[in-house]
Amino acid sequence: MKIRVPATSANLGPGFDSMGIAVSKYLEVDILEESEQWFIEHDLGDIPNDDSNLLIQTALRLAPNIPAHRLKMTSDIPLARGLGSSSSVIVAGIELANQLGHLNLTADRKLAIATRIEGHPDNVAPAIFGQLVIASQIGKDVDYIIAPFPDLSLVCFIPDYELKTSDSRDVLPKQLSYKQAVAASSVANLAIAALLTGNLKKAGRAIENDQFHEIYRQRLVREFQPIKRAAAANGAYATYLSGAGPAIMVMCPNEKKMAIYEAIEQLGLIGQLVSLELDRQGLCLV
């Protein structure tokens, strides 16, 4: 049995901590045989391969009595780059407990658990459901809408350095004034409405006019402005920080993708440039 969870790109500008899409990079966990102790085969560097791994910790949090197994983990989701690497592990851990513990969890229950562990639903929701998900957490209640995502292309630049979410949150203000909050939420409302109605030019303007986090975090990602300028010059709808960064996502018309890819490539930045697709399935067994 194999558990597969997609990478995710959260926020999409002003949808701070509440909106995200699933994209075509994946964490996969093969459930192998029972063993005396938990052991995870992987070639992912310094990640623990015993029960201190977040995957197993999450599973045991839900089902502490499940038998130890040997697992195999593979992933092309880069760590601490803004593509939901920790969320994918949390969601996989929940499903691991669900399968081995025969918990029969509903998708809604998985989301509630994942949000409680992660602290916000913007990554875990699309990791579970795929597509574009807009979610709200009030206390213990998590409401969400799975929405159709427009037909467009995604080009992502992944810098070769990590940016921890905690460090990226440290640059955010502790509070906004009432006037700032109204302005920021109006931009978010417009971005969502424009995405859902297919008005991609207005969606792009709203995404790039975020007032919640990007105006504070941009300085942490030196590649952001050069990529944004190159993408805009070649017809992109929007460029935004994926999650807390440092990954940078460009939304563009399908016919502009290659020109934008080549323009970013010519900047000579150090990192990985990839073309991504929307993942429509989310968490699944394969």
From Swiss-Prot:
Binding sites annotated in the UniProt record for ATP: P78, L79, A80, R81, G82, L83, G84, S85, S86, S87, S88
GO molecular function: ATP binding; homoserine kinase activity
Protein's GO biological process: threonine biosynthetic process
Compartmental location: Cytoplasm
Cellular component terms (Gene Ontology): cytoplasm
Cross-referenced InterPro entries: GHMP_kinase_C_dom, GHMP_kinase_C_sf, GHMP_kinase_N_dom, GHMP_knse_ATP-bd_CS, Homoserine_kinase, Ribosomal_Su5_D2-typ_SF, Ribsml_uS5_D2-typ_fold_subgr
Pathway this chain belongs to: Amino-acid biosynthesis; L-threonine biosynthesis; L-threonine from L-aspartate: step 4/5
Keyword Heme (UniProt): no
EC number(s) reported in the record: 2.7.1.39
This protein's UniProt keywords: Amino-acid biosynthesis, ATP-binding, Cytoplasm, Kinase, Nucleotide-binding, Threonine biosynthesis, Transferase
Primary subcellular site in the record, as a coarse category: cytoplasm
Reaction equation(s) it catalyzes: L-homoserine + ATP = O-phospho-L-homoserine + ADP + H(+)
Function: Catalyzes the ATP-dependent phosphorylation of L-homoserine to L-homoserine phosphate.
Protein family: Belongs to the GHMP kinase family. Homoserine kinase subfamily.
Annotated NCBIfam families: thrB
UniProt name for this protein: Homoserine kinase
